[in-house]
Amino acid sequence: MAPPAARLALLSAAALTLAARPAPGPRSGPECFTANGADYRGTQSWTALQGGKPCLFWNETFQHPYNTLKYPNGEGGLGEHNYCRNPDGDVSPWCYVAEHEDGVYWKYCEIPACQMPGNLGCYKDHGNPPPLTGTSKTSNKLTIQTCISFCRSQRFKFAGMESGYACFCGNNPDYWKHGEAASTECNSVCFGDHTQPCGGDGRIILFDTLVGACGGNYSAMAAVVYSPDFPDTYATGRVCYWTIRVPGASRIHFNFTLFDIRDSADMVELLDGYTHRVLVRLSGRSRPPLSFNVSLDFVILYFFSDRINQAQGFAVLYQATKEEPPQERPAVNQTLAEVITEQANLSVSAAHSSKVLYVITPSPSHPPQTAPGSHSWAPSVGANSHRVEGWTVYGLATLLILTVTAVVAKILLHVTFKSHRVPASGDLRDCRQPGASGDIWTIFYEPSTTISIFKKKLKGQSQQDDRNPLVSD
């Protein structure tokens, strides 16, 4: 039997989750948000995926109560198809089948995808020990939410219903080891609500006690928030807050998969979590849009019900989105000359200093991608490897010669400058005589050509100048 994590991953990315209880792995999404699958609009046309019976078309079952002739406008999801549906509010979707000797003309559909978030599944209970080992009670008015509320008040994480009237609570994370059963084996109706499944004989249906809570704090990327007391009708005089805060989210997408609020005074609001400004207000008079986005990472969901009227409530699926910062892509098919130009532009300040930027360019007989030292170049074998080694030695030798030449030139210039001794104060008169000062040699070095040495008189020789002779006017 597969562990629960794998099973829950097949249900949805929107499994009911709080920050303290992370959701299972994501999927495309659940196909049901109600306990009895009344909202199922999937395309399963067999009573079971393995060993099931084919369903009859709803537009060919005129001898039965539910058909397209009686419900021509698609009520209950009926139409010219043979998909499983729940038009009468039974405990799960079903369909008509060809009659057999036992007289059965309809069957429940076992649909793995039609399992509301928070429904953990149907499991075997052999009683020694039971799947949930906490407290328990029995009631002839048992519903899913009365059992969940009882277990939640006792601070248990899980609630289980069995045989329609028994409620079990516990924190046992290994409940799945007792063995999973088909969902149709937990279709015994709850004694308090005949439209809800409450387990079976030796079969327990499990729920997360977060379902139907009045308030909570959500931080998961995706989750489902139910109205208070769900799947029962919400009570009167309810005031509930849920915080949805996903750090780093650029927006949060909301989708009301179920919305049944009939009283015009009952309302659902979405508020800016930072300013408490009302973003969206929904009530019995204003139906929500199918879906919408809120460009925030912190939203407050607020629900209010007055003292009269009740309804099924709502189920809202939210999905947060985080936008990754744009990343700079490396240049594609960039030539070596472009790389050299880019590096030279980044080092443009070197042109105004005494430092020299050395650039080795390839021989014209070699294409740019085979230039020595290029990272995109791959070594070859045989004669090609010797050619590459030769180019590498050539480049290093050229660089060494240029460096030594520059150093020698700088030394010669330094010696020449030092040879002109600064005269004493008594000799200043002689130094001002025409022709008394020596000629200053200025050296310009260009790596791509040769070294040029020529005489150049500094401007304003009659005035003292302490500039570095290497700095040109």
From Swiss-Prot:
Keywords: Cell membrane, Disulfide bond, Glycoprotein, Kringle, Membrane, Signal, Transmembrane, Transmembrane helix, Wnt signaling pathway. Its main location: membrane. Residues 31-114 form the Kringle domain. The chain crosses the membrane at residues 393-413. Residues 116-210 form the WSC domain. Pfam families: CUB, Kringle, WSC. It is found in: Cell membrane. PROSITE patterns: CUB, KRINGLE_1, KRINGLE_2, WSC. InterPro entries: CUB_dom, Kremen, Kremen_rcpt, Kringle, Kringle-like, Kringle_CS, Kringle_sf, Sperma_CUB_dom_sf. Residues 214-321 form the CUB domain. Residues 414-473 are cytoplasmic. Disulfide bonds join C32-C114, C55-C95, C84-C109, C122-C186, C147-C167, C151-C169, C190-C198, C214-C240. Disruption phenotype: Animals with a double knockout of KREM1 and KREM2 exhibit enhanced Wnt signaling accompanied by ectopic postaxial forelimb digits and expanded apical ectodermal ridges. They also exhibit increased bone volume and bone formation rates. Triple knockout mice KREM1/KREM2/DKK1 exhibit enhanced growth of ectopic digits. Residues 414-473 are annotated as: Essential for apoptotic activity. It is a single-pass type I membrane protein. The keyword DNA damage does not apply. In the adult, widely expressed with high levels in heart, lung, kidney, skeletal muscle and testis. Residues 1-19 form the signal peptide. CDD domains: CUB, KR. Receptor for Dickkopf proteins. Cooperates with DKK1/2 to inhibit Wnt/beta-catenin signaling by promoting the endocytosis of Wnt receptors LRP5 and LRP6. In the absence of DKK1, potentiates Wnt-beta-catenin signaling by maintaining LRP5 or LRP6 at the cell membrane. Can trigger apoptosis in a Wnt-independent manner and this apoptotic activity is inhibited upon binding of the ligand DKK1. Plays a role in limb development; attenuates Wnt signaling in the developing limb to allow normal limb patterning and can also negatively regulate bone formation. Forms a ternary complex with DKK1 and LRP6. Interacts with LRP6 in a DKK1-dependent manner. Interacts with DKK1 and RSPO1 (via FU repeats). This is Kremen protein 1. It comes from Mus musculus. The gene is Kremen1.
